[in-house]
Each structure stands twice: as C-alpha cells, then as structure tokens.
C-alpha cells in the first residue's frame, strides 16, 4: 500500500513513541522503557490480528544479567560466540513481571476502550509468575542492536576507562 499511496503501516516508523516507568515503588529512576507501536505486526511482517491494533514493547534499562562474547576459534573470519544470557538474574525477571502487569493496567484504562481488542501476546491466560516466566523465556529479545558496545569505567566489568583507554593494554 505504501508504494502506491504512501499510506498505511509503511508510512510509519513503527515505534511512534516511548516512555519510561518504574517497575515498582521506591526506585529512584525508571528501570523499564516502553516502545509503543501503532500496529499489531511482528518483526517478520506477519500480523497476529485481523484489522488494526497496537502494541507495547517493554525493555529493561539496566538489567543485572550479564552475557559474554568470546572467540569461536583462532580464525579471525569466524563469527564470535555470543551468550546474551537474558533473564539470568531473578531481579530482571521480577522487573518484567511487574512491567507486564503495569502494561496491562495501563491498557485497561478507559481511554483505550475504542481501540483495545483481545490481548494477543502473552494472552489473558498468562497470569502467574511461572506462566509469565515461561512466556518470557520463549519470546524475550533485545530491541537494540548488539554490535560491540562495552562498559566504560574503573571497575572490573569495564573494558575502557573514562578516557577510552583499554584496560590492560598500553597506548591503545
């Protein structure tokens, strides 16, 4: 449709707005981020609904879980091995559980009445912590593009210092 009329889903950047929330009271800063989409479409272009829809993607701003990247072999042409290790820490799972429940509460507000249909994912039958954890384990992914970022700082987890000097390597 967009090729012919410059209208429809193709005219959108898909992520029309975002927002930040605290998954629980007492946090100094929001720990979760929303990406709101004015369409019900999957990354592969498929649609889980007939007609119009909207969705929210939830991301953790500062997860405790840590992954790793390491060499597959001595051949520099071999791609690296990557373990994202999402949701390895209980605190991260709890933040997503709380975030899902807050998202449901948000979309149950009367302002969404004219637009809201049935919950597609994870679906209204996913309610308990175990059910949410199972859904997360099957569907969680990053909204970002892993490409070689590294921690900056003076601590043991940092790769470079605040002046961008690589720890353990002189003059680089």
Task: Describe the function of each predicted region.
Residues 1:
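Active-site-adjacent helix/loop segment of glycosyltransferases
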Residues 4-172:
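FAD-dependent oxidoreductase catalytic-site/capping-region signature
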């Amino acid at each position: 449709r967009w090729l012919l009329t410059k209208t429809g889903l193709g005219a959108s950047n898909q992520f029309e707005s975002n927002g930040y929330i605290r998954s629980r009271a007492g946090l100094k800063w929001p720990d979760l981020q929303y990406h709101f989409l004015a369409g019900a479409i999957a990354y592969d272009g498929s649609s889980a609904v007939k007609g119009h829809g909207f969705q929210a993607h939830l991301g953790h701003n500062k997860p405790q879980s840590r992954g790793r990247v390491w060499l597959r072999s001595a051949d520099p042409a071999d791609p690296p091995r990557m373990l994202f290790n999402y949701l390895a820490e209980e605190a991260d799972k709890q933040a997503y559980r709380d975030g899902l429940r807050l998202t449901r509460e948000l979309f149950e507000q009367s302002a969404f009445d004219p637009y809201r249909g049935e919950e597609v994912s994870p679906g209204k039958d996913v309610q308990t912590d175990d059910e949410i954890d199972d859904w997360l384990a099957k569907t969680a992914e990053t909204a970002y593009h892993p490409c070689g970022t590294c921690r900056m700082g003076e601590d043991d987890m940092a790769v470079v210092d605040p002046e961008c000097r690589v720890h353990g390597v002189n003059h680089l």
